[in-house]
């Protein structure tokens, strides 16, 4: 395990002296890394930028590992990869979310995947000419948030229903992707993705402000 410490420049030598004493007492060895920046949402979700330029992302920010489909994290959800990628670009490179979305034309980054288990099934619901149309879907579906589309609802045989995306947002099912289809034809609702990106940015910045206030008390 490990911990992060914020050390004044004039206390660095004292810090290393204390570490050496601890190693002698415990017969254990400490390892040290230096960050140029540490962006923390909470203890399980953070981004670290090392002084050598390398980065480390944990929890919901592990977009790079998810994108590469590393075996160790196949259990994690790859939904809406554009969100953690944009948050990462904002904090590590200063790229505004609007600019990031403008250059990300990979449809897979805007997709989410959901699965219905047990007695649950998916329904696609839309209204055309004042008539409700219901389409039964398969157990595993992929979709993105679109300007025009349907509401995707997970339904249980006991009558319970859960919207895949609550509120005003519409979805388009995309279980198969046409590699020849231009990205501009997907009708992606970028307002949804911007909202999600800014929610995470604001959450992190609030944590950062709170941490700075707490540190100032000492």
Sequence positions of predicted segments:
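Catalytic palm active-site di-aspartate
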Residues: 1-6
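Flexible, active-site-proximal loop/turn residues at the rims of small-molecule/cofactor binding pockets
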Residues: 9
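C-terminal, non-catalytic extensions of nucleic-acid polymerases
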Residues: 12-218
